[in-house]
Amino acid sequence: MTDSAINKKSKRSIWIPLLVLITLAACATAGYSYWRMQQQPTTNAKAEPAPPPAPVFFALDTFTVNLGDADRVLYIGVTLRLKDEATRARLNEYLPEVRSRLLLLFSRQNAAELSTEAGKQKLIAAIKETLAAPLVAGQPKQVVTDVLYTAFILR
């Protein structure tokens, strides 16, 4: 064999192990990167907040009330947003008393005041305050988080 043939063969023999080492290093790096990526989502998944609980609504039948003003009538439908299901059950159990409290509250209203946005917001606050008191001594207060008008006619 000539010297040039030996040099070519030795150059090839150097390149083959070198390419094998580079390929193994690339595979090892890719495997490590993949493993690290799989470990990260578990820490991020724990950081997501839980979805908010479903709202609890309590729809009341509509009320028709004579106002203190002469010949004025209020027709109002109300739905209450409550804190929890226990409050809903308690209000349903004492529904006649709840309706009585609201009828008395509505009959004390002034038509001129109810015709404005501020008057309607004031009525919402009054409904929350009226229903917050315990229905029976020894029971907890009712937590009404919001009052929604479903019908509102002022004649």
Swiss-Prot record:
Location (main, coarse): membrane
Domain of life according to the entry: Bacteria
Keywords: Cell inner membrane, Cell membrane, Chemotaxis, Flagellar rotation, Membrane, Transmembrane, Transmembrane helix
GO biological process: bacterial-type flagellum-dependent swarming motility; chemotaxis
InterPro entries, alphabetized: FliL
Membrane-related topology note: Single-pass membrane protein
Protein localization: Cell inner membrane
Transmembrane segments: 13-35
Cellular component aspect of the GO annotation: bacterial-type flagellum basal body; plasma membrane
NCBIfam families the record matches: PRK07021.1 (NF005435)
Family statement: Belongs to the FliL family.
Biological function: Controls the rotational direction of flagella during chemotaxis.
Protein name per the record: Flagellar protein FliL
Organism: Salmonella typhimurium (strain LT2 / SGSC1412 / ATCC 700720)
Origin organism lineage: Bacteria, Pseudomonadati, Pseudomonadota, Gammaproteobacteria, Enterobacterales
Encoding gene per record: fliL
